[in-house]
Amino acid sequence: MKFTELKIIEQGQGKWTVTIDGTEWTETLKKAKNRVLANLEVPGFRKGKIPAAQAEKYVTPSKIYNEAYRMMVSPAFDFARAQEVKVEPMNSPEPIPAKVSEKELVIEFLFDLKPEIKLGDYKNIKTVKKETVEVTKEEIEAVIDQYCEQFIMEKPKAADAKIEKGDIVTFDFKGFMNGEAFKGGEAKGHKLVIGSNQFIPGFEDSMIGLGLGEAKIDVTFPEGYTPELANKPATFELNIIEVKARELPKKDDELVKDLNLPNVETFAQFEAKVKEDITKQKLQNVKNQFVNDLINEIIKNSTIELPKTAIENQTADLRKEFEAQLKQQGLDIKKYKKVTGLSDEAIKAELTADAKNKLETYLVTSEIRSKEKFEVTEEAINAKFENLAAQFGIPADQIKTMVNPEMLKSEIVNDLLVDFLYSNNG
């Protein structure tokens, strides 16, 4: 293989060129032809059992070239990456077959150039403040209750008992709007914990005080619901079949034994562990928010000229992600605009701003990493494996076979960056 690189300053793009020729290309074409033959489908013959004379009629040079190109894209990229590259890409290079012939294959990898930035101050910044972390008794109780859910007892209530918050209710329901049933508003034998907020606001509260048998409740669908129902009143006909009370286990040492948590034997130790876990999570959230705000401050103090193509490409990627998220919610752009009242221009402006911030964040953090030269030690890698093993309940040796080492190192470097920025600012 031969490698060249070209810097296209005017367009803010770079290009790597890799040429495959000689024996390497000849051998690749032979392998490509064999692959095409092996996967060839001809009416009247089984795949891989087609007589050579018949097969040759269907194997065109373009099919062989296309297969050979697919075979060489990844090796060519690895070859280009292994060179002492002067041109630094900011995104994933896009491969293009510039020339394909019997003599050679030329692949071009196009990418946005990583712009030179003038990094502002990133230490001793006092304008971003750190929040203090406090854990309340109520928060500890809420987490303990979640643990208790594993051992909850369900006891049927008396026939004349009324529904209370926390009860488990089995019921049929059918929704009506303007006197007509609507799609998706009906179910039989549905089981619901009152107060779990599984239904729209007001639905579960309206069930409190009801008894067994038939009843009606009136609700209004919230603003962010599907366009067909958003902000509209509806009536639900209910048939309450069964009401059960939820009985939590006693919060004592016996509960702790049932939980079988490592290094926790008494309820007092359990409470301490819960408080410690909440504190760690809150501290991590505070730290992440602080660093996000800090990075935005560093961006303001830095000089960055983003290539127009980089912003456009990143905006397009965010648009695809956004549309995919809408699809998961049963929406599309048209329905989203109707619900929110936003125009195409407003949506594009928001996505463009997000794209710009994402690119600037990448460049600023990349520059800080480069300057500080964070070192990933074996101890840090092993500690990360142990944490993952504890988190998922899988042996560390098994985790090592499941996790990409480079991605793990990247995570560790990011953790080091966050810790560094948090410790040296505020």
Curated annotation (Swiss-Prot):
Reaction catalysis annotation: [protein]-peptidylproline (omega=180) = [protein]-peptidylproline (omega=0)
Primary subcellular site in the record, as a coarse category: cytoplasm
Annotated GO biological process: cell division; protein folding; protein transport
Annotated localization: Cytoplasm
Coiled coil ranges: none
Gene Ontology terms for molecular function: peptidyl-prolyl cis-trans isomerase activity
Gene3D superfamilies registered for this protein in UniProt: 3.10.50.40, Trigger factor ribosome-binding domain (3.30.70.1050), Trigger factor, C-terminal domain (1.10.3120.10)
Domains (record comment): Consists of 3 domains; the N-terminus binds the ribosome, the middle domain has PPIase activity, while the C-terminus has intrinsic chaperone activity on its own.
Listed name of the protein: Trigger factor
